[in-house]
């Protein structure tokens, strides 16, 4: 029989009982997003203007290094959190962030910038993964889409604000060092909040899972999400392609806009508009998927992203590109939290962190692939063809999700027994 003291101390699931920790994790993830945002409008231009890098492929190599490090960190973050606790991995992620702005400020060569982005990738893989898992742990299965919508909204609204501020600062003061002072502040506050106030949520996960549930080994979770379970595989490939076009938007779009004659401030505004729409609308799209199901939002979102990229590729004015990036943000908002919630629907609570780590490994590997593919095609055939190629791949990914969902029917949007 459970004693009164044990019953009293047992974690309770739900947004209401856990709103303080939930709100804290929203704030922490905003600072995680800010670390990436400070780079989005500045670093591609820094490669060309300060380090004299002419090749588009070389100029976007920082995105590739970031994507590689983040993908690997994602893969192991869930497994490490099962062994050492969510909070410990969150704090470790912030420790990797601390040197990044200083390296970017003082980097004597482009190799140092690539190294800084390896550290930033680990920061994002550990810290962002843990804010995702900790929020899911706290709220339980019924509010999963809402929780992830709030998490991703906070992160990507912060990306937008930081990208815009960095662009404005760079326009007024230069590409270095002033824009990267933002990163020093973000890392200091994010680390302090995580160390002083964040609490581990592994106990909440165990309440949902039950007392005798055992986690699936990483090797098996990797196989299931990569080739064994068609529904999981369809979600994994959609995440990969979604970030393929994000890698293109991060690495290639600033170069494309600069080659078209836009000022740094306008490039910063465009770089901010995409994550601004993406982040803001996730407040609605995650909750919507809880009610109407995941698949319709994923398929429609991927198709809208493909259309947006096609418009960006043929556009030749600031107004057209602003509309295209707004549409890209809309499509991404429909997809991003919904894919995460769908993974959570299809696996047991004890497997969730590990399987989400595998999914995020492939998803963020897409950013690396998008930067390298976009850079290589841009070097050979020009920016516009690179953008149109990724547009076609994105639309095709949405069709693939629809086909597999029709072949393997079953509504996602609620817990599935596996």
Where do the PLM segments sit?
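Residue-level signature of mid-helix packing/kink "hotspots" within the transmembrane helices
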Residues: 67-75, 160, 275-283, 367-368
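Helix-loop boundary and gating motifs at the non-cytosolic
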Residues: 16-67, 233-234, 238, 242-260
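Juxtamembrane intracellular "pre-TM" segments in multi-pass secondary transporters
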Residues: 2-19, 200-235, 418
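Cytoplasmic helix-loop-helix junction between adjacent transmembrane helices
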Residues: 116-156, 341-342
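Helix-to-loop junctions at the C-terminal end of transmembrane segments
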Residues: 73-85, 170, 281-293, 378-379
